[in-house]
Amino acid sequence: MFPPSGSTGLIPPSHFQARPLSTLPRMAPTWLSDIPLVQPPGHQDVSERRLDTQRPQVTMWERDVSSDRQEPGRRGRSWGLEGSQALSQQAEVIARQLQELRRLEEEVRLLRETSLQQKMRLEAQAMELEALARAEKAGRAEAEGLRAALAGAEVVRKNLEEGSQRELEEVQRLHQEQLSSLTQAHEEALSSLTSKAEGLEKSLSSLETRRAGEAKELAEAQREAELLRKQLSKTQEDLEAQVTLVENLRKYVGEQVPSEVHSQTWELERQKLLETMQHLQEDRDSLQATVELLQVRVQSLTHILALQEEELTRKVQPSDSLEPEFTRKCQSLLNRWREKVFALMVQLKAQELEHSDSVKQLKGQVASLQEKVTSQSQEQAILQRSLQDKAAEVEVERMGAKGLQLELSRAQEARRRWQQQTASAEEQLRLVVNAVSSSQIWLETTMAKVEEAAAQLPSLNNRLSYAVRKVHTIRGLIARKLALAQLRQESCPLPPPVADVSLELQQLREERNRLDAELQLSARLIQQEVGRAREQGEAERQQLSKVAQQLEQELQQTQESLASLGLQLEVARQGQQESTEEAASLRQELTQQQELYGQALQEKVAEVETRLREQLSDTERRLNEARREHAKAVVSLRQIQRRAAQEKERSQELRRLQEEARKEEGQRLARRLQELERDKNLMLATLQQEGLLSRYKQQRLLTVLPSLLDKKKSVVSSPRPPECSASAPIAAAVPTRESIKGSLSVLLDDLQGLSEAISKEEAVCQGDNLDRCSSSNPQMSS
């Protein structure tokens, strides 16, 4: 705690033994008597360090005393010279000693406190030792009880071992039966596979024989094709002879062609005429439609002129009188509607306030109930914690049983390994069965392919027979043509022209070449198909041989695997026996410990159940009170809901009446708008017509002015009156026209303003309706 004031190094204990503390003189310091005789081991090092620091000071004091005793004369002589130095040194030493004394007193106080603490600790340890002795006695008693329980458990273990041995014997018997059945099934599958392989070999041999026969048939077909080619060369010569006959027939047919050409041209002309008639009819219909439209326009123009004349006859009213009365009515109606809406909003606001007050009251009741529930939940949590503490104690007791459970788990793992080995053996057997089945499927597919190839052979035979029939028919036709040619030659011996004969020869040569190409193609196709069939047969034969080899290898592998599986089964049986013995012993010990723990748990659970029943009775009583309060709150809520429903029905009725009134007013306004639009259209038509009339009047004036000028030249005596008379109507016409235009423009402006005001009012009405719907929706939801 405090750094040493003397030397920095440690002094061995032999130094203190060589210089005991009893040899100190009479004026030794007082701190040596305060050191306790028995010090704690933690503070021995500190005390030794303090003694080491104090040892040099003691030696210095001894030297001073000895020098004072032995040499009094010398000190008296040198007193005058060294008096001042010795006094100063002694004062410094005394000051240092005082500081050391104070420090040592503090350390002594601390050591006393530590000694008291150690005494308290020793007393506590003594108490703990007594408690441990008592616990050992109780543990010995418990051990004796456990030994007795183990003795009973051994009896149970023996019984369990006997039962487990019986079960193992039954399991082994069943396993042997399963193995025998599997081996029999495997042998049967192998026998079936061998029989199938033999059948496939036989089918391959039969296919080879068939292919040899087909090759012979193909050679014969090739020979027949060569013969047919020779016959075709002969038939070409016959066809050249028949060319003359064909030319004669063409000439005969050419004489009758013009009548057909005339009929075709007549039909084309008739179709063209019909198309032109249709186009003309369509044009007529379109012209009729345009005429009708023009007539309608003329009628509308006449009607507009009549209306314009009537309007001109009338006097133009001022613009102030054109304001409609329905705007005032609309404003008054809107004001009344707004007042009603305001009244309804006030009612809704009052209902909302009442509802909010009731909701607040209910929330307060719910909060109080929640507080009660939380208090009950806290009590339940306390009880649960007590239960958890007791459960923890039980778990501490169960920790001893976990060792036994681990041993049981090891035994179970050994048993699982044995089961896994058996499962792996079964899986290997399944794989063998699957391989056999897959080989069977592959053989079936190959057989199907072979059957398909055999099925294609009749089609090839049919094609060959068809070619032979075609050749026979060609022969018959050629013979017929030859006979006809001979007859014609006899009837008309004149030779045909050279050009026709050459053409017929070319055609016959082309037909000959085409027939040769067809025969060559058919022969090539037949050869290709025969080659393909041979290749397929050889490939299938090779594949079947490979499959047979693979099956033999698989059989050998399965036999080896069965032998290894037998060895594994024997090892697994031995391990199973050992594991069953260990499991039986562990089960007995577990049952004993479980019985003991079960009794202790039942006692503790009974105590906890009594406490919980008391607490549950209290909670049930409180819950019944809360349910009563909740029922009261529900009744009040239902009353409030009924009132809200009544208010809602009233508001719906008012809304329906308002909607009906609004619809009627809208219909009336729509009628009024239609009338105004009709008047507006009439006025626009009149304006357009007015423009037309002004143009007509200008043209009329331009036509009339030259005649007036001619009259003015002829009549010189009275030139002014005609001008006045001519200018007067023009001046009269101009102001009237301008006044009419001004009045019409004012009328149009008024109509536009009125339509804008109506549209604005409708928009405002729609917005109010939307606001009212939005305000009513929250009330409905509340």
Curated annotation (Swiss-Prot):
Keywords: Coiled coil, Cytoplasm, Developmental protein, Differentiation, Nucleus. Transmembrane segments: none annotated. May be a regulator of keratinocyte proliferation or differentiation. It is found in: Cytoplasm; Nucleus. It comes from Pan troglodytes (Chimpanzee). It comes from the Eukaryota. Residues 62-82, 177-218 are annotated as: Disordered. GO terms for biological process: cell differentiation; protein export from nucleus. GO terms for cellular component: centriole; cytoplasm; nucleus. This is Coiled-coil alpha-helical rod protein 1. Residues 82-314, 344-437, 498-691 form a coiled coil. It holds the Pfam family HCR. The keyword Hydrolase does not apply. The lineage of its organism: Eukaryota, Metazoa, Chordata, Craniata, Vertebrata. Residues 62-74, 208-218 have a biased composition (Basic and acidic residues). The keyword Transferase does not apply.
